[in-house]
Amino acid sequence: MSAHTTAEQSPKRRRIHLDNDSKMHFSSILEDGTSKSQEALLPPRRARGYQLEMLSESLRQNIIVAMDTGSGKTEIAILRIQRELERCPAHKFVWFMAPTVALVEQQHSAISKQLPAFQTRLLTGAANVSHWSTKKIWDDILLNIRIVISTPQVLLDALSNGFVDLHTISLLVFDEAHHCVRDAPANRIMRDFYHYHRQEEGTDGLPHILGLTASPTTRARQTDLEVLEINLNAVCVTPKMHREEMMQFVHMPEYRSIEYQPDVQNFSSIVEKLSVIINELDIENDPFVKFMRRRNDLKSRQRLLDALENKKTPCLDQLKRCLRRSRVIHRELGPWASERFLTRCIMGLKSKQTNASGPQWADWDREDNSYMLNVLSQVVSSTEMGVQNPPDELSRKVHKLIDFLVLEHVNGSIGIVFAEERTIVIMLAQLLSLHPRTKHIKTTAFLGSSASVSRKSDITELHNPIDQSTAIDDLRTGKKDLIIATAVLEEGIDVPICDLVICFDLPKDLRSFIQRRGRARKKGSKFALFLHSEDRATSSELHLMEKTMKQLYLENKRALEHIQYLENVEEEGYDGFRVASTGALLTLSNARNHLSHFCGTLSAEFIATDPEFVLEGDDTTGFSAKVILPSFLDPKLREFRGILLWKTEKMAKRDASFQAYVALYEAGLVNDYLMPAHHHIDDEDGLEQVEKRPSFAKALGSLNPWAAIAKKWREAKHFYQNLIEISAGAQAFPPMVMVLPVELPCDISFRLFWNEHSTLLVSVKRGGQDFAADLIRLAADTTSILLSSLFSQKMVPGSLDFSWLFLPQMESIPSAIREWCDSVTGTISLHDIRDCDMAGFENPGLVRPMDNTARPCTFEKLVWRKYVPAETSDGASLSEQVTYDREVPHIEGRVWPKRTDFLHRLEPSNTSKAHHTAKCFYPANNCSVDRLPVEYSQFALFIPCLIHSIENYFIANELAQTILHPVGFSNLSLVLTAISSSAAREASNYQRLEFLGDSLLKLHTSIQLAADHPLWPEGRLTMRKGNIVSNGYLANAALQTGLDKFILTKPFTGAKWRPSYNTDHINTGDMTEPTREMSTKVLADVVEALIGAANIDGGENKILNCLKIFIPDIKWSPLNECVNILHHQEDSFSDENNNMLSEIEGLVGYTFKKKPLLLAAVTHPSSKGSGHSYQRLEFVGDSILDIIVVQELFESPRCFHHFDMHLMRTALVNADFLAFLCMNAYREEDRGEAVENSKRRVTVAMTKRRAYLWGFMKHSASWDIVNAQQRAAKQYEKLHEEIDEKLRSSKTYPWTLLCRLDAAKFFSDIVESILGAIFIDSQGSMPACRIFLERIGLIPYLKRVLSEDLDLMHPKERLGLLAGTLSVKYETKRTQGVEPQRWECAARVGDEEVVRVDCRVSRVDAETTAAEAAVAILKTRKLQSEASNKVAECD
């Protein structure tokens, strides 16, 4: 048996029995006459439960969907087409048929926009399908086509000629299926081909059938419905209407009848003149007769005889048709309209004559045109044609219409006037647009589309095809508010809800009557019919229609009253559900409200969140309900059924809601207070919205490691000596020893900056525990000597209780140390130096002026020079002594720096004398020189820096050995960097590590949460992750663990440095101060920096240990374990077959082992089905993308500054950039296009069609999504070449162009969800993820960012920098009265409006464009100002 059960074989037929139920069915049509256009005009609507019910039924068997106009039949068809194409072989396709060209064009537009991944083909007469005369042409035209949209006649002809095989069609869709009767083309397709094959071969291989209709028959007879079902081999089904929906008030129009008296049939002189001229025409002058007389063949002679006998030629036919229509117009509209009609016919002929010079015009075409123009020009003179008189002589019927419109068509009204004749439609529209009383009404005309050759050449066809193509859109957008139309607008065509529908000509039957009335749905709407007072037959028919309609209304009203009565029946429910810990109670009464609230808190763009109910049963058996929850919930938590049968639908829905909410509670999505867990975070959870944190927190004072060391001095029996070496290129310093009672944490090295040009490298190497206790006192003496050389005023006199001891590297015996101390103690006076005798000064110490008027200096040499006030080489005076003419001995040397901070580079702008080491000259007789060699004094000068650096390592080590002990850091420098804030001005700070750690934290948190909570929706995962990685939460973790006391925030300056004594530390304790104010951001940053440091020090294991310390709320697991869990979770994904996936795999460059992962990755959360959507995968992919980019930036050999890395990451992972990459990803496929040459021979030219990645996204046939796709695609077509060029070669990032795409979030979501799917399917393979990113263009641009110096700063950020201290404001607003919606923005800096931009596609576009323009202006001003200053300086 085939997949689609036949009508006769169906075990669950839900037939509409018109003899019993037809009145209710038709009444619902009368009540709800919304057109298909409401999907675009009303708020966005997802696939409703009844639409999914119809979809499911269509997948099971052939059906005719009978649903009210405006209830979403087209969406059902689109969902069905998508499902069919996903499961059918690639060589098969879908054929969609609609009865009119206008409807075909409309449905082609809808389907191609809704299903952009599939090639569609519109086939109408305009494509000259009748000239496609070979099968090869058809095969080429249908190559790679998956959906064909045409009228039934096109398919019938193709099947009849054998150009198309019915077995290659997988699904036939009949829109307005009630036309499939008798000898209609749709029925001939079924009768001559479908049923023929069915009888011969069975249904195997035949297409599935889907019919769509709002009115199954035009007459209310059961037999007619049975015939329709037989014709389409389908069952007519309709979804069950909920009482709740039926009880909602629907505005029914007020019926009005407009009676008019027909005009006396006295035609105007012009019409009569045309009649006379046509009757008096000499047929021998007719172009056709002349042409045939010139031919001698038998066929031509016969055609000539027929023309002469019947007086029938092409020109005569058109002229007579023109006469007939002018008379109809005269009768219906009046003399003015008929005369204006003839004038327009003449103008049309003149226009054709002007344009008839091309090769496509045959000679007889020109002759016919000239002949008819000559005839008609005798009727209306050129003078009369040039006069544009306002409508004056009008029919009584038109006067009645104008009176009615003036009264009823008020401001804001939208109306339709139905007329039968095409020429009446055109002329009535022109008449109303020109009449003084109605010209304020914005009137247009709509005839539908027709590609008939006869109509193309008909001189009476006055409509403009361009106007026809925009008429409906103009009505939707408000450019027009009244449309005059033929019956083509009765059904199918999307038009807005109207409040005024007028039948200028009466409907032909009940169905037409119902369809027209259905267009009037607004509150207070009017439905008016023009009645000919003398036409009794018409009046009788209309009376029957009115009677039928009133009867339907009355019965519907009674039914609604009965339903309301039934729903008010009180029923006793079952016991509620009580939470023991809180006492919260869930009952049948409050369950539905709870459920609605829960769903509402998970709102997202393009997703309707209200629960849907599907009812089963009836008044006899009782009702049960199924509730369908939004698709962002896991499929296991998406559908729930009530457990009992109820008398009322109300209680059935409450029952289903109760069961659903209990299940949500048990799944952990509802907390103990019966509130959504994702929306109401419990205080005791520790994850409250800590982003509402203060900027600063009270933190512990900085740790003082010397306090613990001071205690060790009192207790230690053995001491550690550590070697200190200082080098500066060729210059060598004597090695020194540092003695401590504890072991150094590690070898230490750092740099010292002696002056602007000289940098020293300090190395401290740990030594053994081999310094004798009896040498401690001597080491204290050496320390005192060293410190006294420079810090005597800061020392405690007589105290040797230092926290650390220093001495030169020498033999560790008392005599050697004493000898050294004796040799370096004291000074030598230079007062008596003569003849530059340098004996005894082989290794001199610092030279000091005896009057202390100047800083010490080094001793380089003794020189003779005139006695002048001592000065340095830069001219700084060092004394005020009198100048002598004779030369005296001077000490030449370098000034000793006054500063003690050598850990920081000297800035070029710093001119403080404390930094100078310039050359100087001191009079020798006023100086003394230290016995302590200058190298030791220089070492003493470095002691503050040395102590500070060692102190930091002791702090870092204490942290590593206590709080961070589980991590097991091996590189203490990483810990030190991680706890060093930028304010501390250490050699390295945490910012780069924090940048890496932030990404690692998000990665592990995202993957862990996704693995631990398979039922959590993306919204809750995101909120939970956001809380965990928030600065507030991490700052709290730092305070809770005591990390705060280890954080370095105070910069070293050395300005107030003094030697450290053990006694002081014992008295003050292990804190430098009790508490301090610390930025909570710094606290959080240090936690992230430690995570980054752990990664560098030991990879994932150390990261996990670090996470366990600071975030113990989560049970952390290795990434591979989490990925395995996620990989196995895929087993619960939908396993439905989808042939589309291989195309996506080719596009993304990865073949999935588990195909449902890819299907989920391209499924929008609005999509209805049994599978997952992309939201959770996007949640995972976001963190994968971030870590790939961050690691590349962090590991770059260029060692970027953290600020630059932030700019780079933002440029590479922002939503606009990802959206562009998504829109720029495509695969090409062949497409054939018919080409007709001048001889009307048809060939097929092969072209390429791009299938874009975004087009494969599955969704719920949402017009909001489609419109967003189309807007962005339109912008992409305008901008993509420029954006591509900017990304390839520009030095500036195209922020403005990217935001101008106005791309919805789902474009970037697709990139991240596919990345997440690849990561899980490959079980954590980053190379596989990189291949995808390489393919879509992200990695190539990342390489540019890494290798080139690009300006990546956002214009708004750049403007803020240029503004300096001035404020920057953006005054943004919508541009009024512009369609489509546009924005304008003024950028203000301080009080000045720098620039104003308009006509932008979004608020973001407006502000970004304004910022970019303002930046350009301010930069120009700056350059001009600098140029002016230079000119001024030159002057």
From Swiss-Prot:
Residues 591-684 form the Dicer dsRNA-binding fold domain. Gene3D superfamilies: Dicer dimerisation domain, P-loop containing nucleotide triphosphate hydrolases, Ribonuclease III domain. GO terms for cellular component: cytoplasm; nucleus. The record marks K1305 as: Important for activity. A motif (DEAH box) lies at residues 175-178. Mg(2+) binds at E1178, D1309, E1312. Residues 956-1099, 1141-1323 form the RNase III domain. The keyword Protein biosynthesis does not apply. One of its GO terms (biological process) is defense response to virus. ATP binds at M67, D68, T69, G70, S71, G72, K73, T74. The keyword Kinase does not apply. Dicer-like endonuclease involved in cleaving double-stranded RNA in the RNA interference (RNAi) pathway. Produces 21 to 25 bp dsRNAs (siRNAs) which target the selective destruction of homologous RNAs leading to sequence-specific suppression of gene expression, called post-transcriptional gene silencing (PTGS). Part of a broad host defense response against viral infection and transposons. This is Dicer-like protein 2. It comes from Coccidioides immitis (strain RS).
